């Protein structure tokens, strides 16, 4: 199977998000890369489901809370930008202050 660099990036991100979900389910607090991966995967899957950019920008702020991440992580992530594939093409989704 041949994958483009973009497809490899998406696969790596999705794998990191799965690890983050499992750690969260075990009650562990997420670190920076796990937090970014989980929120980014949520946005990518929402786009695939046909949600709007505006709804993903809002919903992306409620994926994680401060109690679910390690100390200092929310301050390290002022914004998350994800280029997601929607039914009508690729769009950039920006989530400001994603961990509240």
Swiss-Prot record:
Class of enzymatic activity (EC top level): hydrolase
EC number: 3.5.1.5
Disulfide bonds, paired cysteine numbers: none
Compartment list: Cytoplasm
Reactions catalysed: urea + 2 H2O + H(+) = hydrogencarbonate + 2 NH4(+)
A single Gene Ontology CC term: cytoplasm
Cytoplasm recorded as keyword: yes
GO molecular-function terms, A-Z: nickel cation binding; urease activity
Hydrolase is among the record's keywords: yes
Keywords: Cytoplasm, Hydrolase
Gene Ontology biological process terms in this record: urea catabolic process
Bilayer-crossing regions: none
Pathway: Nitrogen metabolism; urea degradation; CO(2) and NH(3) from urea (urease route): step 1/1
InterPro entries xrefs: Urease_gamma, Urease_gamma/gamma-beta_su, Urease_gamma_sf, Urease_subunit
Family: Belongs to the urease gamma subunit family.
Subunit structure: Heterotrimer of UreA (gamma), UreB (beta) and UreC (alpha) subunits. Three heterotrimers associate to form the active enzyme.
Name used for this protein in its record: Urease subunit gamma
């Amino acid at each position: 199977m041949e994958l483009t660099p973009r497809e490899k990036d998406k696969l790596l991100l999705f794998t990191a998000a799965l690890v983050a979900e499992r750690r969260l389910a075990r009650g562990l607090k997420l670190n920076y890369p796990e937090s970014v991966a989980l929120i980014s995967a949520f946005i990518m899957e929402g786009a695939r489901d046909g949600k709007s950019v505006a709804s993903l920008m809002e919903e992306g702020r409620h994926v994680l809370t401060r109690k679910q991440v390690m100390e200092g992580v929310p301050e390290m992530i002022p914004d998350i930008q994800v280029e997601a594939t929607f039914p009508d093409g690729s769009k950039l989704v920006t989530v400001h202050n994603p961990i509240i």
